[in-house]
Amino acid sequence: MAGVNEIRSTFLDYYRKNGHEVVPSSPLVPRNDPTLMFTNAGMVQFKNVFTGLEHRSYNRATTSQKCVRAGGKHNDLDNVGYTARHHTFFEMLGNFSFGDYFKEDAISFAWNLITKEFGLPKDKLLVTVYHTDDDAANYWKKIAGLSDDRIIRIATSDNFWAMGDTGPCGPCSEIFFDHGDHIWGGPPGSADEDGDRFIEIWNLVFMQFEQITPEQRIDLPRPSIDTGMGLERVAAVLQGVHDNYDIDLFKALIRASEEATGVKAEGEFRASHRVIADHLRASSFLIADGVLPSNEGRGYVLRRIMRRAMRHAQLLGAKEPLMWRLLPALIREMGQAYPELIRADALISETLKLEETRFRKTLDRGLGLLSDATESLVEGDRLDGETAFKLYDTYGFPLDLTQDALRQRGIAVDTDGFSAAMQRQKAEARANWAGSGEAATETIWFGIKDKVGATEFLGYETEVAEGVITALVRDGAEVQSAAEGDVVSVVVNQTPFYGESGGQQGDTGTISGEGFAIAIKDTQKKGEGVFVHIGEVTKGTAKTGDAVELKVDSVRRTRIRSNHSATHLLHEALRETLGSHVAQKGSLVAPDRLRFDFSHPKPISAEELTQVENLANEIILQNAPVSTRLMAVDDAIAEGAMALFGEKYGDEVRVVSMGTAKHGSKEGKAYSVELCGGTHVRQTGDIGLVRIVSEGAVAAGVRRMEALTGEAARLYLEEQDERVKAIAGALKTTPSEALERVNALLDERKKLERELADARKKLALGGGSADGGSAVEAVNGVNFLGKIVTGVSPRDLKPLADEGKKQVGSGVVLFIGIGEDSKASAVAAVTEDLVGRFSAVDLVRAASVALGGAGGGGRPDMAQAGGPDGDKADAAIAAVKALII
């Protein structure tokens, strides 16, 4: 029986042997496609290749693409765990031709793979074609020998694929496997096609047309192929099971869940184990690709998935966070194929554990509210939207979690009411969020790239260079010239200007030629390797084809280099101090400062922050060379280079190494090794020093550090030194003794505060005074001490009441404190022998009402309350005395 890993390898090896480039899976967060929340098909990373905007070095490719469908229109979340084939995360095997082979070869490749390599019986296979696609039907007859009754013509859009309203499109041909007549269902196109007997395992898309308008469709000059085979589906077929959750991969994950919970995946618990297994995959891969749980966008979809799994863990009786304990099983099954799981192990584990720990605090309370709200509901009823929204807003229950919790009882949720409540609160969950907020792909730069090629970057070695203007863009359109006063984007054949990326800001400077000059205010990377210099023509007229001299602002670049190199050192110092789970989540490398966002679940202590700074400065003081090497990405990572989770790297990467580790597991090796395309100092000593100026949380599990280097750090320390001198002067001491002087003053203040409190206590207990009230008196035979005091804080009233109880021996005590704002605090106390007759809670509530308050609380022997009307203190004492009967 072939396992999932073997099936994946067989597929990729087969197409590699047939001339296809094996391309790694792209991240789950799509690059350069703001229309998608997550990568949901193998063709996503090739979209610009299919449309002609991008060109690759190969025209045949094959992939095993990780996919997520759990947001927007591609949302399988509700069904996951309850059906045989729904998943949030899945792998799509595919082969692609970019204008190379077409229908005949695509069908031949597919048929040979499934019947010869995979060994599926031919009599169990049938196909569909688009009803007008005679070519595909004839090829199936010729290559596979299929009869007409096993080539089903479908006239619906199910067998015609389109990228959008316009653009490439074409007919599809789907391959189905027949599980046998013991399972209900009919062939595709029949009335019973929704049954489970005939299962689609592969879809071949023949891109042969371009849709110009709804009425006009023309032939593509270079027809292409896009195919997709669900790995989990074909694994079920090859392993002789009818349910995806019975394949070896899921059996291993479910077995781990059973062992961790002590509950078998049977009966009512079967769906819960399946939900956990599926959602563990989706959550782990999303975190590995840089998504963290949050309340919006992709992060909110991740949170929905995680919390749905956590609710099912609770159904299985898990008393402690479960998901993170299952991660080793997932890594065993999928880590070899997807090494990002191994690299992100610590981050995934910490994120899963932290999110489940947080959610468990409200899960039980929320489920209790849900139980109370649905107690009178029966199958077919609906839970009102207001309650569903309260569960979301107060207890963190995503709507689909509430729906899932009510599913087995047959109770629906008023989703319109939920949406209305959401609108009123202005807290949209963005379930239909359409993208990451990135600007849409600017096609003009792809056109320029095709025409003039990519820009050669010279900035690692020089800050001055000569070049030729290859393109000018003004107001979104390509122009041939730009005159004085024009704001223009300039493309040059080669440049020393760094284009903004990886958090490092783009360079500024000047581009000049014969009779003209352009002040460059920013440099960006566009399309595929086009450096765009954005600036204003300050003199003359610049034209395409002009020779130019390019000068980077070297002072600004030097400061940026220093801050970028310091960012690397701080990153490694954070990992050494806090743990290997620390990973970069964002950065800003500017000339005046650096900002670094990183994953860490809790606040950082002052001692830890000092250690991070000291470790970075140790490497700076080494004045060690900063080396760069070009390496294959896998080799670089194997040597320990840090890669950003979710970042897409080319075949060759730039590896930046700094310093020598003096302790720990890396002792004697390079201290910091990262994949980085930015600019850096030559020696670590060029940084001067680094000073951390702030650190704090910016999101759940993400913290932000800001720091200064070099001259900026020196000026900051100088400013701090001047402040210390000014403070010392005000204290009439020296800077070295300022702290000692401050501590002495604080001790003196505490001493005086204690003496003042003692004096006030004595005054309050000393009988008649300007504070009002009286000494101990008898009220209906009960000793009563009622006092009105000022200058005593509410927290000091209870100690006064304790002293008052000693003074009366047996009786009732009431102290009312009047604050500077005329508000009153009251404490009532009853000696132990009278607790059976009087309750301090009842007494203090009577006082509170008289003071304009709303009651109080405490114990029968001591209770506290307050009120806004301090001038009614005498009435409050009278109200308490009236209760002593």
UniProtKB/Swiss-Prot annotation:
UniProt KW keywords: Aminoacyl-tRNA synthetase, ATP-binding, Cytoplasm, Ligase, Metal-binding, Nucleotide-binding, Protein biosynthesis, RNA-binding, tRNA-binding, Zinc
Binding residue positions for Zn(2+): H564, H568, C676, H680
Annotated InterPro entries: aa-tRNA-synth_II/BPL/LPL (IPR045864), Ala-tRNA-lgiase_IIc (IPR002318), Ala-tRNA-ligase_IIc_anticod-bd (IPR018162), Ala-tRNA-synth_IIc_core (IPR018165), Ala-tRNA-synth_IIc_N (IPR018164), Ala-tRNA_ligase (IPR050058), Ala_tRNA_ligase_euk/bac (IPR023033), DHHA1_dom (IPR003156)
UniProt remark on cofactor binding: Binds 1 zinc ion per subunit.
Top-tier EC class: ligase
Reactions performed catalytically: tRNA(Ala) + L-alanine + ATP = L-alanyl-tRNA(Ala) + AMP + diphosphate
Pfam families attached to this UniProt entry: DHHA1, tRNA-synt_2c, tRNA_SAD
Localization, UniProt: Cytoplasm
Entry GO terms, CC: cytosol
Domain of life of the native organism: Bacteria
Function: Catalyzes the attachment of alanine to tRNA(Ala) in a two-step reaction: alanine is first activated by ATP to form Ala-AMP and then transferred to the acceptor end of tRNA(Ala). Also edits incorrectly charged Ser-tRNA(Ala) and Gly-tRNA(Ala) via its editing domain.
Protein name according to UniProt: Alanine--tRNA ligase
Species name: Brucella anthropi (strain ATCC 49188 / DSM 6882 / CCUG 24695 / JCM 21032 / LMG 3331 / NBRC 15819 / NCTC 12168 / Alc 37)
